[in-house]
A protein has these predicted regions:
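Conserved alpha/beta cores of soluble small-molecule-handling proteins
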Residues: 99, 105, 134-136
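Anion (oxyanion) recognition and catalysis
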Residues: 101, 166, 295
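Residue-level detector of anion-binding/catalytic polar loops
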Residues: 106, 171, 300
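Long, mid-chain structured domain cores
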Residues: 93-94, 101, 116
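Aromatic (often tryptophan-rich) hydrophobic motifs at membrane interfaces
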Residues: 49, 57-60, 73, 79, ...
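Conserved acyl-donor/pantetheine-binding loop and adjacent beta-alpha core of acyl/acetyltransferases
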Residues: 65-77
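Conserved GNAT acetyl-CoA-binding A-motif
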Residues: 103-114, 268-278
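A conserved beta-strand-loop-helix scaffold within acyl/acetyltransferase catalytic domains
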Residues: 2-51, 55-66, 112-250
């Protein structure tokens, strides 16, 4: 039996320490990241203790009697340590289902942590989803990921863009000018989809100040004018492109091709470079043009899965 405690702000330090020592948590689960937008979500995260020792965490929010893990994060999932066994994970899911059912929830929607983010094998939760929860897969997004020690050659279309950008004199450098990049990103998203980025420029700068080594911006510039860039989220096993965008001049001159050529040259001391999803948020419909570009750099498929079960 586990003692189940609902997360409160007083648990912040203990929570963050557990995430840092876990086998599958990343800085996205750190409360200094999660809580930047806590006004948008009603938190209902759980902490699982055994004999007074913290064994597992579930980052979650509630909405309309549905429990989500977690709507404000790219991925959710149960956070555990290397010492946690399969039997214990099965027990955790049995007890968390009972807890949330007593609390009046009728459904759980669960975003699993993709395996590329695991520091040690961590798929005990996937087994529990079928054996304990009878969960069903309701959404599968596909991302493009490079195994950094076995990179494929770039395709000719990507090489052509790289040559074009080099001939134009485009320069690649790390930057803290989040406002300049956000303006390019916002214009692109607004023109294409009529939406704004998930993060505001102010939020990105706040998160950068809290995680200076994990959040990094690289820009492609011409005569000091930003033409495009990418914001990278760096975890122990993955460099992930949280945002990628270029203006019209940058697109015509191959700015992003040269940008990723230079970024992929760097020694990141991680296993994977992940370009992120190429599927729509609502329908999982594949954006073929987008995935063509990512696969041109050598990216291949990794899935981000979402499950659902009733209580």
């Amino acid at each position: 039996m586990f003692e189940i405690v609902r997360y409160a702000a007083s648990h912040k330090d203990e929570w963050n320490q557990f995430v840092a020592q876990s086998k599958n948590g990343t800085f996205l689960f750190d409360r200094n990241y999660m809580d930047y937008h806590n006004d948008r979500f009603e938190d209902h995260s759980l902490m699982f203790y055994k004999k007074g020792k913290l064994y597992a965490l579930l980052a979650a929010n509630e909405k309309d009697h549905i429990l989500y893990s977690h709507q404000g994060l790219t991925y959710g999932g149960l956070i555990t340590t290397v010492k946690t066994t399969t039997d214990e994970v099965l027990q955790v899911f049995h007890e968390l289902n009972a807890y949330y059912k007593r609390a009046g929830f009728h459904k759980i929607i669960y975003k699993a942590i993709p395996s590329i983010y695991h520091k040690w094998p961590s798929e005990e939760d996937l087994y529990a989803l079928t054996s304990i929860c009878q969960a069903r897969l309701i959404m599968r997004d596909i991302s493009s990921t490079i195994l950094l020690n076995k990179q494929f050659p770039f395709t000719e279309s990507r090489k052509s863009g790289m040559r074009k950008a080099s001939q134009a004199g485009i320069q690649i450098s790390e930057s803290d000018d989040f406002d300049a990049f956000w303006n390019i990103l916002q214009a692109n998203l607004h023109n294409k989809y009529g939406i704004n980025p998930v993060h505001t420029a102010a939020e990105l700068k706040l998160l950068k100040s809290r995680f200076p080594h994990q959040i990094r911006l690289f820009l492609a510039t011409l005569d000091d004018k930003p033409l495009g860039g990418t914001i990278l989220f760096i975890t122990p096993t993955v460099v992930h492109t949280q945002y990628i965008s270029a203006d019209e001049e940058g697109k015509q001159k191959g700015a992003l091709d040269l940008l990723f050529k230079e970024i992929l040259k760097k020694d990141w001391n991680v296993d994977y470079f992940d370009f992120g999803k190429s599927t729509s948020t609502e329908s999982c419909e594949l954006n073929r043009k987008l995935i063509f570009q990512k696969e041109g750099f050598g990216g291949r498929g990794i899935c981000y899965d979402t499950y659902e079960w009733t209580l």
